């Protein structure tokens, strides 16, 4: 497998902070949005190009991996605290059809909706460091997979009230680039 790279060509590292910025314009990086002011918060695209979004951290499910690998399952979270009691770990809410927070980093056997994988964008116009995120309830890239089931699909953008949310959209996947958050 290949490591996932940021825009500078460096490998994404476990627990480091990155912005996930949109390749498509208009639209900023990934951030959080409150559905009708309630909790848990949804993962959304920032409305303005200038806004890089909130910093994200990635945690490969394979504990031996300090580098994020293409196609291997991982947990994604916004490390900054929010006003909601739920965790800021991403999860795919199958009922609503959107990515929200309140996920788990459990390595439990069986499928759960907090596992994601990053894959290279496959469109003809894609650049080498363009990626897409898939919802993968069963582990991949680990010694003992938690279950056997393919990924559910690739995340795309969908209107969700006033916000642009992430849903499964294989027809029109959302392509992003990772920008390391500069210290200080």
Curated annotation (Swiss-Prot):
Q: Which cysteines are joined by disulfide bonds?
A: 39-84, 136-147
Quaternary structure annotation from Swiss-Prot or TrEMBL: Homodimer.
**Family per record:** Belongs to the protease inhibitor I3 (leguminous Kunitz-type inhibitor) family.
Recorded protein name is Trypsin/chymotrypsin inhibitor
Write the record's keywords in alphabetical order, separated by commas: Disulfide bond, Protease inhibitor, Serine protease inhibitor
Q: Where is this site: Reactive bond?
A: 56-57
User: Which ranges form a coiled coil?
Assistant: none
Kindly give the Gene3D superfamilies that the UniProt entry links to this protein.
2.80.10.50
Q: What does this protein do?
A: Inhibits trypsin and alpha-chymotrypsin.
Determine the domain of life of the protein's source: Eukaryota
Entries under PANTHER family matching the protein? KUNITZ TRYPSIN INHIBITOR 2, TRYPSIN INHIBITOR A
List GO molecular-function terms, semicolon-separated: serine-type endopeptidase inhibitor activity
């Amino acid at each position: 497998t290949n490591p996932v790279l940021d825009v500078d060509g460096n490998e994404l590292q476990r627990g480091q902070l990155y912005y996930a910025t949109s390749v498509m314009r208009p639209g900023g990086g990934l951030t959080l949005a409150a559905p009708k002011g309630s909790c848990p918060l949804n993962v959304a695209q920032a409305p303005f190009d200038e806004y890089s979004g909130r910093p994200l951290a990635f945690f490969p499910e394979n504990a031996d991996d300090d580098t994020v690998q293409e196609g291997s399952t991982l947990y994604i979270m916004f490390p900054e605290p929010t006003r909601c009691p739920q965790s800021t770990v991403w999860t795919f809410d199958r009922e609503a059809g959107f990515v929200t927070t309140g996920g788990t980093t459990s390595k439990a056997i069986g499928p759960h909706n907090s596992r994601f994988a990053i894959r290279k964008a496959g469109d003809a116009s894609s650049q080498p460091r363009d990626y897409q995120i898939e919802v993968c309830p069963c582990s991949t890239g680990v010694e003992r997979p938690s279950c056997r089931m393919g990924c559910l699909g690739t995340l795309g953008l969908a209107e969700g009230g006033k916000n642009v949310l992430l849903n499964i959209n294989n027809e029109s996947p959302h392509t992003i680039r990772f920008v390391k958050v500069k210290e200080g």
